[in-house]
Amino acid sequence: QKILPVSRILLGGALESPGAEVTPGVLSALAVPVSTKNPDPYEISGQLQGRRLALAKWIVDPRNPLTARSVVNRVWQHHFGKPLAGNPNNFGSKGAKPTHLGLLDWLAADFMEHGWKLKRLHRMIMLSATYRQSGSHPRLDKLKNEDSDNSLFAYHLPRRLTAEEMRDSLLVATGELSHVQGGFPVMPEINMEVALQPRMIQFSLSPAYQPSRTPGERNRRTIY
């Protein structure tokens, strides 16, 4: 029978400075136990198998107050350019309070009830009256004065596109987008001056950047 390796706290994050021994467990601050049968309900069983599964089940436990809310908050931010709850990287009691707490909770509950399906969540948001609002408003100046950052989502604010979205859109518009998926990593064309610079990989110099040979290989989707 295999013995579990001992895990220790690394002081300062350094491998050379192991500290006290630590056992697998979850955040007790969230008050969502792994099992009430264990002496420590927040400790994951010491068995060799099942530790990752136990952690995964704890993450998606309906009682977990963060996971579903964090996901729907991110999706909302993607579509509107700003989240319902500010500080999405620091989600929780120390972050900014949600502007629409009831909506955030409802979206999170609906998301879990329907199997954590992201496509359904995207579709629901994009078909909403809020998402389909115009950027103009009969009292736009008054709204901007009273709600300068549009935290109430009274009108549509243009969202900055990512470089990946812009590249894919250009390839679609020109009819050059390749819909092939899988296989080796794609190397798109980049600025020649950048491509000719030697690359540092694993502490050694690598040859200059070489794009994939044919347009069919280069013009794959940036985002899957």
List PLM regions with ranges.
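Primarily short, surface-exposed interaction patches in extracytoplasmic proteins
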Residues: 1-221
